Structure formats: C-alpha cells, structure tokens
C-alpha cells in the first residue's frame, strides 16, 4: 500500500510539473504550484523512508544469493 501511495504522489508531482511547463502559469499559479509540490514532497518523503527501510534488508539478503547465481 505504501508503494502505491508513493507512486501516486510521484505521478501528482510529475503532472504538476508538466502543467507548469505546458500551461505557462501566471505568478499566482506559480505560488499555488510551489505549495502543491512542497506538500506532495512532505507527504512522499516519509513514505520513501519507510520503503527504503524495508527494501534495504531485502537487498542485502538478496545480494549474496545473486552473487552465487552469477559466480
């Protein structure tokens, strides 16, 4: 579920960035976009940290197995 939330937030940030480039917003729009991006990043950062804490031990455990298959 955390992965889904992170992907969703990344998609929102990408969509906002795309709209900034395509729509050429006014100054008021730029302030709203900056706040939206800041809010999305604040929400995505804790999720990314949780995913990292889970993924790192898995990667450490999988590395010797992968090395054994290759070597």
Curated annotation (Swiss-Prot):
Thermostable. Still active at 100 degrees Celsius. Keywords: Antibiotic, Antimicrobial, Cleavage on pair of basic residues, Cytolysis, Hemolysis, Immunity, Innate immunity, Secreted, Signal. Residues 24-35, 65-71 form a propeptide. It comes from the Eukaryota. One of its GO terms (biological process) is defense response to bacterium. The keyword NAD does not apply. It is found in: Secreted. Residues 1-23 form the signal peptide. The keyword NAD does not apply. GO terms for cellular component: extracellular region. Homomer of four to six subunits. Female-specific peptides with potent activity against Gram-positive and Gram-negative bacteria. They have as well hemolytic activity. This is Ceratotoxin-A.
């Amino acid at each position: 579920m955390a992965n889904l939330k992170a992907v969703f937030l990344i998609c929102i940030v990408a969509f906002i960035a795309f709209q900034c480039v395509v729509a050429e917003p006014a100054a008021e729009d730029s302030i709203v976009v900056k706040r939206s991006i800041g809010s999305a990043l604040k929400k995505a950062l804790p999720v990314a940290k949780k995913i990292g804490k889970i993924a790192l031990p898995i990667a450490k455990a999988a590395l010797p197995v992968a090395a054994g298959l290759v070597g």
